[in-house]
């Protein structure tokens, strides 16, 4: 659409071209089949959304009725019990990254809006403060969309096809770009944009890390002054620090503070904890102190070489705290860790041999997990490319400066290295899976996939049974915990889920692949279940809440597994309900799967209450649960997902708006600065350069993203000339 040289009105297309999104993107002719020939040949998802409105140019009018939020849907939310979440988990997530709102190295918003109106002052809603045109009901206590009863739900409509789950609306919500999603309903589009803008506001401006930088001069606090009282330390961490605290070095104190920051995630509320009522600002202060301590060492030791400072990967204020796990593997290969010392260096001490084996297993495991998250092949050949043997089954106390190690313990004896050994035993299988799945121009035959899946599944089940069979050999001997068992199963079984997914998706049209669907349901259920113990002991595990806290606050693996496994269960359960092949034998398993979905929705709701960006997943899975509920209650083939999506979006907006008003960034800034005992008006860069005697040149700007996109986002420590650069870029 354009305006010609004569000034005539823009010409609109009378009829939009009917083509799937992939054909439109590739600018090729679409045969309008489902799926079309090009998408089927390229193994792409064929989606027809030619009715998508041009949201950037369309004028959104308020809905005609503001009271239709609840009346539009009769979906009742059951008072199903919530997950046992403790009230002391307001500190959400610990990561070694930019330490912003989510405190995670791995979280970066998938896409930031190109409108500078979103980046407003943190203490005001600005453009988001306008009253919404829909009525927002306060969130209910439960998420029982998956009603256990067989009462018919009011799901009549023409929006979502129950019998065509491949293009179901909830899958569109889950896999779309959250900043460009479309709805047929103009009201839903407006609700989505408002809620998404509020989520981005909380994610991008909730905890600007520039506020927490201070000078390395005499005003920097001592590490010992940040150590909390002993009652608090004993709850967060068990260390022999109090025997001689004055003799501890700053390096040890920084490590101690960071370890206690991790402990705040798992520490339960107790009267003896003293100051554990709200440890979030204190934990933030500890992490920022460790970050700045390391930064001061780097800067001062480098004589303030500004060239190095400008290109440092730990640039101030940005999310550039990134270290590739592939670099660790290649570094290990340069050190020769991938070659077994007994073969290539027989004269090496036994202790050093054991340490090198353990280090290689650790670095390789990090690379495998990162490759799976990034959907990339492993930087190793399929045959492994290494001959390092497995670590010996020895405890740390058995290692010493001796030429030869003692005989390793039998496999039935649990030691410090047992978990590493079990992980290492499946590494070669997982390397083959990753290279077959993600290597270019490589397709994995179905029989080969079944063989790998069977091999990995047997290994996972064998490891699970082994950990559950350990018995104390001596009084006080080490025993695997439920948490360790779950982490081991999580790190290995998630590869099985990735291997089965391509074939399970095709099982709806090819019944010869039915086994992969059942196997994926089983793997997803185990990934979302905790604890994994099959014993008859009654009562919850004493550490039963640890993994739940990681599901709520964790990023990376924990976030990805929660999303992928829940989506797989929703998709496969919907397809099984559509086929209704085994109505008698599947009734009880389907009820258990519905409970797993309810638990996942509860976790996403709690993540959102802790300002974790998960609106897209929450809305998608609530809509999926509504579709499952309609199928279980034998509704018609069509249902209207509009009331469910509208209700879920209203709950998201209510939660996010409450978070923004109650937990403003100014509040966190004041609390954290108070813990650090720092002047809030301090200019980090001027003090830093004046301390070192350097000229006050421009620091590396934390507004690199906004400069690149022509946005204005000034920060408290920006020098006047750096603000001029921002204005010029605009």
From Swiss-Prot:
Report which superkingdom the organism of origin falls in.
Answer: Eukaryota
Where is this protein primarily located?
A: nucleus
Q: Which residues bind DNA?
A: 20-46
SMART domains recorded for this chain? Answer: GAL4 (SM00066)
Q: Which PANTHER family has this protein been placed in? A: ASPYRIDONES CLUSTER REGULATOR APDR-RELATED, HEME-RESPONSIVE ZINC FINGER TRANSCRIPTION FACTOR HAP1
A GO term, aspect molecular function: RNA polymerase II cis-regulatory region sequence-specific DNA binding
Q: Briefly, what is this protein's role?
A: Transcription factor involved in regulation of gene cluster that mediates the biosynthesis of aspyridones.
Sorted keywords for this record are: DNA-binding, Metal-binding, Nucleus, Transcription, Transcription regulation, Zinc
- CDD domains cross-referenced by the UniProt entry: fungal_TF_MHR (cd12148), GAL4 (cd00067)
Q: Which Pfam families match?
A: Zn_clus
Note whether Zinc occurs among the keywords. Answer: yes
For this protein, the record's PROSITE patterns field holds:
ZN2_CY6_FUNGAL_1 (PS00463), ZN2_CY6_FUNGAL_2 (PS50048)
Mind listing the GO biological process terms from this record?
A: regulation of transcription by RNA polymerase II
Recorded source organism is Emericella nidulans (strain FGSC A4 / ATCC 38163 / CBS 112.46 / NRRL 194 / M139) (Aspergillus nidulans)
Supply the name of the protein: Aspyridones cluster regulator apdR
Q: Where in the cell is it found?
A: Nucleus
A single Gene Ontology CC term: nucleus
- Read off the SUPFAM superfamilies from this record: Zn2/Cys6 DNA-binding domain
Q: Which gene encodes it?
A: apdR
The record's InterPro entries line, in alphabetical order, gives: Fungal_TF_Env_Response, Zn2-C6_fun-type_DNA-bd_sf, Zn2Cys6_DnaBD
Keyword flag Transcription regulation: yes
Signal peptide from the UniProt entry: none
